[in-house]
Amino acid sequence: VSNLATAEAMIAAYNAQDVDAYVSYMTDDACEAGYRGDVVREGKEGTRSGLAAAFAKWPQNHAEIVDKQAVGDYVIFREHVTRGPASDGSELVEPFDVVAIYSFEGDKCSRVEFVR
């Protein structure tokens, strides 16, 4: 399976709000972070709990892959994200675009960085 196919499977799991499937594609010490910046979800378990909380807050959350390419051990997606209404009544988040850079070690994703 190619890194591109794995990253696409991660987005499919994300859109299904299946945190277990999403983190199954990650290394144990994987993380999600701002581009060249602070880690926002540390490790597979931190990613699992962080995404579960996000999905509980935004049950209609969805990411559409607008553009994609694979370069070496990296997959780069331009994603259009729609949150929908928040379950806690907080202010609506307008849809936004993000560039996501998936770094791979072997067949597992070790880091996802977001440029927004």
Enumerate the predicted regions with their spans.
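Short, well-ordered alpha-helical segments enriched in acidic and aromatic residues
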Residues: 16-33
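Short helix-capping and inter-helix turn/linker motifs at the boundaries of alpha-helical repeat units
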Residues: 1-2
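Proline- and acidic/polar-enriched loop/turn elements at helix boundaries
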Residues: 26, 37, 114-116
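A beta-strand edge to alpha-helix "cap/lid" segment located at domain peripheries
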Residues: 5-6, 15, 45-116
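Short, electropositive, low-hydrophobicity segments enriched in small/polar residues
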Residues: 21, 41, 47
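A short gly/proline-enriched turn/hairpin at secondary-structure junctions
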Residues: 31-42, 53-57
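Generic hydrophobic alpha-helical segments
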Residues: 9-10
